[in-house]
């Protein structure tokens, strides 16, 4: 298990490095070896996608390990560990990630379709920013961290420059000129909740409008999608003890709601408009393995536990 955790961290660090390598190649390349000709806005969108992923991978590490080193440029593999400054203050990490997502959202489309589905959008960037800020406002990272003696060996710089646009009003109430060697704030700041709530509302409004999203089940087509596919009969309705008679309106509505909840997590794109960032890279085997109790399932040669179990 310790090896598995270390491997996950290394993978995300590697992805961050690959993103920065991509940015360097794009910025330093006129386009001949990448594309014969840039389409209007294409280069800016590629750069924005890379910044979105950099922010996302930093958040994935932050969520798992707390304060982390913030990587702002490509780091060669030969770099000695002595040149790394260590972890940054948790709030600094949060504000830097939020800033990166704001920048990325400026050059990302609100939606994707067809073969581009799953690539970064401004809707995803705003939703991810809202989640990052919600974590930062929660009690663990907002005044109730149990290990007050946990300190860094080097100072974390200030982050007021990260508060731009609508976040500029929180520059003085949340941002700092210098964090010193502190890694987690020991004092409660109500402004963090205010900022998080505002980000959530903006993300929701943007998703409902520019993003074309809506809650699943709010339109009649959600209730009848698979009824149409399976035929206009009652065979698509589930069996529910005590509610066998489909001619009773209450029974029918209950069964339709049961089916709606089933298809909410199984509907194929683009039927479920509630999806903001769909994940299509997982197969059924990985989901099954993820539900198997620890030390039950071994690899084929029986030398290790599959999936880390």
Enumerate the language-model features and the residues they cover.
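Extended, hydrophobic/aromatic-rich amphipathic alpha-helical segments that build helical scaffolds
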Residues: 12-31, 40-70, 90-108, 117-143, ...
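An aromatic- and glycine-enriched ligand-binding surface/loop that stacks and positions planar moieties
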Residues: 5, 68, 123, 135-309
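Short linear capping/connector segments at secondary-structure termini
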Residues: 35-39, 73-80
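Surface-exposed patches in mature extracellular/periplasmic domains of secreted proteins
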Residues: 31-36, 110-118, 143, 208-219
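Second-shell loop/turn segments in exported
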Residues: 8, 80-88, 116, 181-188
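Short, flexible loop/turn elements at secondary-structure junctions
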Residues: 21, 74-77, 112, 134, ...
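Short, surface-exposed helix-loop/turn micro-motifs enriched in polar/charged residues
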Residues: 1, 35, 62, 114-118, ...
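Single conserved hydrophobic/aromatic residue that forms the stacking wall/gate
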Residues: 1-11
């Amino acid at each position: 298990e310790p090896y598995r955790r270390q491997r996950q961290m290394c993978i995300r660090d590697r992805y961050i490095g690959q993103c920065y390598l991509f940015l360097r190649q794009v910025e330093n390349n006129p386009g001949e070896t990448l594309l014969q000709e840039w389409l209007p806005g294409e280069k800016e969108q590629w750069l924005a996608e890379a910044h979105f992923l950099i922010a996302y991978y930093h958040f994935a590490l932050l969520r798992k390990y707390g304060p982390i080193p913030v990587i702002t440029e490509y780091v060669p593999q030969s770099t000695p560990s002595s040149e790394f400054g260590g972890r940054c203050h948790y709030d600094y990490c949060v504000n830097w990630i939020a800033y990166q997502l704001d920048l990325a959202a400026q050059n990302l489309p609100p939606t994707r379709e067809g073969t581009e589905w799953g690539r970064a959008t401004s809707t995803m960037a705003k939703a991810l920013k809202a989640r990052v800020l919600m974590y930062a406002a929660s009690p663990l990272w907002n005044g109730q961290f149990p290990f007050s003696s946990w300190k860094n060996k080097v100072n974390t710089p200030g982050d007021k420059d990260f508060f731009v646009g609508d976040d500029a009003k929180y520059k003085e109430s949340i941002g700092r000129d210098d964090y010193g060697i502190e890694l987690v704030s020991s004092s409660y700041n109500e402004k963090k909740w205010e900022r998080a709530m505002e980000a959530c509302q903006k993300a929701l409004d943007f998703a409902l409008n520019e993003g074309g999203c809506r809650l699943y089940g709010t339109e009649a087509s959600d209730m009848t999608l698979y009824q149409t596919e399976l035929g206009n009969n009652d065979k698509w309705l589930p069996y529910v003890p005590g509610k066998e008679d489909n001619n009773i309106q209450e029974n029918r509505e209950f069964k339709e709601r049961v089916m709606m909840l089933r298809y909410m997590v199984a509907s194929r794109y683009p039927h479920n408009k509630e999806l903001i960032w769909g994940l299509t890279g997982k197969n059924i085997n990985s989901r099954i393995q993820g539900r198997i109790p620890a030390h039950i399932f071994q690899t084929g040669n029986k030398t290790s536990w599959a999936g880390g179990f």
